Amino acid sequence: MNTIQVIIFAVVLVLTVTVGQADEDSAETSLLRKLKEAEASLFGQHLEESQHSREKRCLGENVPCDKDRPNCCSRYECLEPTGYGWWYASYYCYKKRSG
């Protein structure tokens, strides 16, 4: 009789633990879903835009560039050097002129 009680107790204990974990997992999942919804409502589209709006790798100032495919940063433009750099026969990234 004692062994049957021990077996029943063990089965009840195992069921209690597994059901309790299932409840914790579902509560955690629902909390995560609520947090994602709150984040989406607070920040909206701004997060998605800023995530993809970062400028890709680009060249800085006074760096050689290809005039056919310039990959200078947005505030620079690919121009033929003037003055001291004319003998290099290459284009360089220079700050855009205002005006």
Swiss-Prot record:
List residues modified as Serine amide: S98
As for subcellular location, the record says:
Secreted
Under InterPro entries, the record lists: Toxin_22
Expression sites by tissue: Expressed by the venom gland.
Looking up Pfam families in the UniProt record yields:
Toxin_22 (PF08092)
Signal peptide start and end residues: 1-22
* Superkingdom of the organism of origin: Eukaryota
Which cysteines in this chain are paired by disulphide bridges?
C58-C73, C65-C78, C72-C93
Task: Could you list this entry's UniProt keywords, alphabetically sorted.
Answer: Amidation, Cleavage on pair of basic residues, Disulfide bond, Ion channel impairing toxin, Knottin, Neurotoxin, Secreted, Signal, Toxin
Q: Which GO terms describe its cellular component?
A: extracellular region
Propeptide positions in the record are: 23-57
An example molecular function term from Gene Ontology annotations? sodium channel inhibitor activity
Comment on protein domains? The presence of a 'disulfide through disulfide knot' structurally defines this protein as a knottin.
Please state which protein family the record places this protein in.
Belongs to the neurotoxin 14 (magi-1) family. 08 (Ltx-4) subfamily.
Function text: Insecticidal toxin that shows strong lethal effects on American cockroaches (P.americana) and common mealbeetle (T.molitor). Possibly acts by blocking ion channel currents. Also shows significant analgesic effects in mice models of pain including abdominal writhing induced by acetic acid and formalin-induced paw licking tests.
UniProt protein name = U1-theraphotoxin-Tal1a
